[in-house]
Amino acid sequence: MQEQAPAQPITAEELLSWRRQLLAQGGEPGQLDWLLEMAGGLGWQELQALRLHPSRPVELHCSLHQLHRLWQRHRLQHEPLQYLVGCCPWRDLRLAVAPGVLIPRQDTELLVELALEAAMDLPQDLELLWADLGTGSGCLAIALAAAWPASTGLAVDCSAEALAQASANGQTFGVNGRIQWLGGHWWQPLRPWWGQLALVLSNPPYIPTAELAHLDPVVRWHEPSLALDGGSDGLGALRLVVEGAALGLAPGGMLLLEHHHDQSSAVMALLEAAGLEQPRPHRDLEGRWRFASGRRRQS
């Protein structure tokens, strides 16, 4: 969304009446309130307080007309709100996102926590070098670099559009001095560092091709299929990432993956077939097996 001059103040009752009218036409209240916060600058607690003070003046970052246009594009054309406002809150970051770049999901935040835990259990003689395969918006790479300042990282994506967005986000958060952004497919751009990577994490596409047609239109029509389509069984990219780990990881290095909640057994089998030790599943916030880890055997 382009920057706009602050709108003229309105009363709390005018805003609440506008909100009621829009929701009467359809849509989720939580999503409209998210738009009010991200585009209008009005947080949930402030919105709640307005109910008690109907005559209070309210200053928004943009006009109700502008908010209405964005909401209609979301409700009628199913455009993701994150694309419409150009940002996505994720972990402790506010990442810029745009069409062509996958919108970071909250579940993926746990992959950073798993990576930080794994970092504490790495062999002491390993260089603190990590890689993010399929970086997209750069969410994982930026969060890990910010939380692990002693480390350096390599972030890979085959989409030039995604890589440009990730690099811009890295610049915003001041971590580009410790991340190299590399174009290419999975392990291929990392060849100069094969055998040196202490930690590799990846949230690759894992949705079976046949299931893409059944996704919510917000996802199906607007987010990049390149970041969603995992092939006929959903495991195509996961296989490539796991199979490369035996060469790419340093001895004792860790691989961390996100996958679909019904793929845990298959991913465990892939880790074992690749010769990785200590294959483990990990649960998401809903208690589903959504992540996996394995370690390259130490020499």
Language model: regions and residue ranges:
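Residue-level signal for inorganic ion chemistry
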Residues: L35, H78, T108, L140, ...
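Conserved AdoMet
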Residues: E37-E117
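General small-molecule cofactor/ligand-binding pocket signal
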Residues: A96, Q180-L182, R280-H282
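Conserved SAM/SAH cofactor-binding pocket of Class I
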Residues: L110-H214
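Generic C-terminal helix-cap and adjacent flexible tail
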Residues: M120, E277, R295-S299
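Mobile active-site "lid"/loop adjacent to the S-adenosyl-L-methionine
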Residues: P205-A237
